Amino acid sequence: MRVHDQRLRFDVTPKPMGLNGSSLITARSVALLLFLSLLLLILPPFLPPLPPPPATLLLLPLLLMILLIFLAFSPSNEPSLAVEPLDP
């Protein structure tokens, strides 16, 4: 059984963005956003009003924010990565 040396090749040349479907903003995504925007403008007058959410549900975003702030300022258990020169 032979093992072949396979190397990955990466193409790093910049390519122009076109309307061929590979760009981030396509005609389909723009049409979808316009459709959803129109629905948000048209539907509220026809739908019945919703009751207010329970008080505990209103505390959920506050609790999530407190948790995220705590995690942002807590020290990590990973050792710090130091960059060392390659010269011996």
UniProtKB/Swiss-Prot annotation:
Principal location listed in the UniProt entry: membrane
Consequence of gene disruption: When associated with ARGOS disruption, reduction in organ size.
Induction statement: Induced by ethylene but repressed by abscisic acid (ABA) and epi-brassinolide (epi-BL) treatments.
Topology with respect to the bilayer: Multi-pass membrane protein
Keyword Plastid carried by entry: no
GO biological process: cellular response to abscisic acid stimulus; cellular response to brassinosteroid stimulus; cellular response to ethylene stimulus; positive regulation of organ growth; post-embryonic plant organ development; regulation of cell division; regulation of cell growth; regulation of ethylene-activated signaling pathway
Alphabetized InterPro entries for the sequence: ARGOS/ARL/OSR1 (IPR037468)
Residue stretches spanning the membrane: 30-50, 53-73
Tissue specificity as recorded in UniProt: Mostly expressed in flowers, and, to a lower extent, in leaves and cotyledons.
Keywords per UniProt: Cytoplasm, Developmental protein, Endoplasmic reticulum, Membrane, Nucleus, Transmembrane, Transmembrane helix
GO cellular component, one term: membrane
Keyword Iron: no
Subcellular location(s) per record: Membrane; Endoplasmic reticulum; Nucleus; Cytoplasm
Source species, domain of life: Eukaryota
Domain remark text: The OSR domain is sufficient to promote organ growth.
Family as reported in the entry's similarity comment: Belongs to the plant organ size related (OSR) protein family.
Name of the molecule in the record: Protein ORGAN SIZE RELATED 1
Biological source species: Arabidopsis thaliana (Mouse-ear cress)
Gene (UniProt): OSR1
